[in-house]
Amino acid sequence: MGKLLFTNNQDWENILRGIYSKNELNKNYSSNGLTCYAKRYVDSENCYFDNDGVVAIIGTWAYLNDDNPFNLNVIYQDLKSEDKGVDYVRKHLIGSYALAYIQDNKLRIFVDECHTYALYYYIGREGVVVTNTYYHVEKVSKQEFDE
C-alpha cells in the first residue's frame, strides 16, 4: 500500500518519515509538507510534478480519459485546466483512491466519489496532519482516543 502524508508541522513530518523509513517505504515525492510513498511490492508511478505543482495518488485507480489509464500527467493537466478541473477528474477517475493536488500553493485532497478509500486527519493548535493510516494521526497528535 502506498502512503500519502501532509502536515504543516515539521516535527510531525520527521516523526512520520522515521516510521515510514523503518517500514522501508520508498519516497516518490516530498515538498511543501506533502510526501508520497510508493507501493512496496508493485512498481507503479503515483506522483507527477513540474514547476507549477504536483499530483499524487494512492490506492487502486484508472483514468477513463486517456488511451493510457494510468497516465498521471493527463490527470494533472486536466486538474489544471479551466475547462475540466477537480469535478471532471473525479467523474473520470475510477477505483478506490486518495488524490492530493497542489497548484498555486493551494493543496486539495479528495478520495473516490464512493468514499471507499480512508483518509484520516487531525487539526489542532500544533498543526494539521492528513494521512491514510490512523495510527500515524494518533502518533503525532498526542490525543486520547477511545479503544
Feature map (PLM): residue ranges:
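Cysteine-centered catalytic environments shared across enzyme families
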Residues: 1-147
